[in-house]
Amino acid sequence: MDNRPIGFLDSGVGGLTVVRELMRQLPHEEVIYIGDSARAPYGPRPAEQIRDYTWQLVNFLLTKDVKMIVIACNTATAVVWEEIKEKLDIPVLGVILPGASAAIKSTHSGKIGVIGTPMTVTSDIYRKKIEALSPEMEVSSLACPKFVPLVESNELTSSVTKKVVYETLLPLAGKVDTLVLGCTHYPLLRSIIQNVMGPDVKLIDSGAECVRDISVLLNYFEINRSREEQTLRHRFYTTASAKSFAEIAEHWLGQKVSVEHIDL
């Protein structure tokens, strides 16, 4: 047993989609979350800058004595997950491999779409992971640079958002039967994305898939939180407005949250 919290990091609010799934599947675990909304989105930034920013978030979480770190950001996972995993002596999870595996299990046609930030798409990491597991798959990737700013602005259902999503995803419509939401912000736009892609296209939430791996590692390392320890104190930190973060977090998680602004 290990009653320390699990640390989550993201470029902003997107990683809350992973936290929500964790709270559903593993409700007895405690969360510490840091979202770098002041510097979001990470996707258009150079790899070295993404690496530096991600390490800042990791080091912040380490000061909170977390027992595991979840890089709840596809861009950061693509750039620096391997390095962080090798250097830390606690488990470190990324969100890409779970999403890739789930897409392979889901598809019937072998035609998989991947949407993500420019960095995630340019890295080609989803195609590499999918084809390594199942070489016969046909992967089509599409960068969606406007999606993260819309989510960070809490523009989740506006007419502008619907128009942007429609125009962006049109090249993939009718060409895939499975679509990986290769950015943890994108599930916040899930209903609009589903409407554009059509009801027969299966959407894969890479972050939600990651929670299954969290559960496996908690059991493997025997670091589950004691179920007798009832007091949970989830803590959320943001580099931008605590008020704006709380509005999105409370809407998405369905509960009041404690949010503190920090400067890195």
From Swiss-Prot:
Listed transmembrane segments: none
Keyword Isomerase: yes
Enzyme class: isomerase
GO biological process, one term: peptidoglycan biosynthetic process
InterPro entries in the cross-refs: Asp/Glu/hydantoin_racemase (IPR015942), Asp/Glu_race (IPR001920), Asp/Glu_racemase_AS_1 (IPR018187), Asp/Glu_racemase_AS_2 (IPR033134), Glu_race (IPR004391)
Catalysed reactions, as listed in the record: L-glutamate = D-glutamate
EC number: 5.1.1.3
GO molecular function annotation: glutamate racemase activity
Binding locations of substrate: D10, S11, Y42, G43, N74, T75, T184, H185
Cited NCBIfam families: glut_race, PRK00865.1-3
Annotated protein name in UniProt: Glutamate racemase
Organism: Streptococcus gordonii (strain Challis / ATCC 35105 / BCRC 15272 / CH1 / DL1 / V288)
